[in-house]
């Protein structure tokens, strides 16, 4: 038979999922479902993970991150509640700052101390949630947290994630706190979290061109368009195209946008070969790139048989329907060049040729 304590926890959980009239907010206050002057609400995200919402975190936080915040605030009632709802009590040690709160967390089952593996696991879990509230709070709680500063494996993970993006600063010359800040800022752009993007943009204007670099690299054309037209950009269009072509295979919208602005499409073709970006290569050919000899030389230098096969085909031609558009509207470009839907005319031609002539077709 369930204990009265577990029934009370369940009742609060059910109550937090309901739409409650402001006339009945006193019930939520009485039940302890109140945080930062507003009701606590529970919901699930697209991955069926429980999310905590309140006035300060309208888009939602993971249970673990919400626990870290109430531990920082030394809010013992909510520490107990969020733990009862399933938050990992060990994550409390990331933000604990008073001995009485540390003792409570131990009473609730926390370890005596966290090892490197525990800390890494906490960090990995924080990166799964794609809301502005979550990404901003991750930055505020973790970027300058001493617990994360001396974990060599974490430093290596963040370093590698930023390595290709560090085109206008020396990665070895910045602090790990700045690396983490750039990491969260980049995630906001990757997931197109507009509130978080504005937060980082206003707070870290000295991160020169970082928003532009991430928009290009992560195919966020809407944000790229906004920042490119918002301020003077001191990066030439071919540098922008290099980022669009080299970081991720499928950056069709940002490649097209840079092309319309005047970037060298042949150089983009070479960059796509160097970085083994097949989809990007075919889009460059669709847009009129014809640097086939130089591209073949690069493919041979890399012993890249897939690209050698692709570049050996001789019947490619520009896609006149694509070239005739010359548009810069982000919504229209994204609709036309959606990564999941766009079919390159030249890729289709190569696939048909390859299936006819090869006993082992190239898998694209």
From Swiss-Prot:
Function: Plays a role in virus cell tropism, and may be required for efficient virus replication in macrophages.
Record's protein name: Protein MGF 360-18R
Listed InterPro entries: ASFV_MGF360
Gene Ontology BP terms: taxis
Source organism of the structure: African swine fever virus (isolate Tick/South Africa/Pretoriuskop Pr4/1996)
Domain of life: Viruses
Family annotation (Pfam families): ASFV_360 (PF01671)
Similarity comment text for this entry: Belongs to the asfivirus MGF 360 family.
């Amino acid at each position: 038979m369930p204990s009265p304590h577990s029934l009370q926890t369940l009742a609060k959980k059910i109550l937090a999922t309901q739409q409650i009239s402001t006339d009945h907010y006193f019930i939520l206050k009485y039940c302890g479902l109140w945080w930062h002057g507003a009701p606590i609400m529970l919901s699930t995200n697209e991955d069926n993970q429980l999310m905590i919402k309140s006035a300060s975190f309208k888009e939602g936080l993971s249970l673990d991150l919400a626990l870290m915040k109430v531990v920082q605030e030394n809010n013992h009632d909510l520490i107990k509640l969020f733990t009862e709802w399933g938050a990992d009590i060990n994550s409390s040690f990331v933000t604990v700052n008073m001995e009485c709160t540390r003792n409570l967390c131990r009473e609730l089952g926390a370890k005596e101390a966290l090892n490197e593996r525990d800390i890494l696991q906490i960090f990995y879990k924080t990166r799964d949630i794609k809301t502005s509230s979550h990404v901003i709070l991750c930055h505020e709680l973790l970027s300058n947290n001493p617990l994360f500063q001396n974990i060599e494996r974490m430093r290596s993970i963040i370093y590698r994630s930023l390595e290709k993006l560090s085109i206008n600063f020396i990665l070895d010359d910045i602090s790990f706190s700045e690396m983490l800040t750039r990491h969260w800022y980049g995630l906001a752009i990757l997931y197109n979290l507009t509130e978080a993007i504005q937060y980082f943009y206003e707070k870290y204007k000295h991160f020169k061109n970082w928003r532009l670099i991430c928009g290009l690299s992560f195919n966020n054309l809407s944000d790229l368009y906004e920042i490119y037209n918002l301020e003077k950009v001191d990066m030439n269009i071919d540098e922008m195209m290099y980022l669009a072509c080299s970081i991720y295979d499928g950056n069709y919208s940002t490649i097209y946008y840079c092309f319309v602005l005047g970037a060298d499409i042949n150089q983009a073709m070479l960059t796509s070969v160097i970085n083994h970006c097949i989809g990007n290569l075919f889009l460059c050919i669709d847009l009129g790139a014809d640097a086939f000899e130089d591209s073949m030389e690069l493919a041979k230098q890399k012993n890249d048989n897939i690209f050698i096969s692709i570049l050996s085909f001789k019947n490619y031609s520009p896609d006149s329907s694509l070239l005739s558009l010359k548009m810069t509207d982000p919504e229209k470009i994204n609709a036309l060049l959606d990564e999941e839907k766009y079919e390159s005319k030249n890729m289709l031609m190569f696939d048909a040729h390859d299936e006819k002539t090869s006993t082992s077709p190239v898998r694209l």
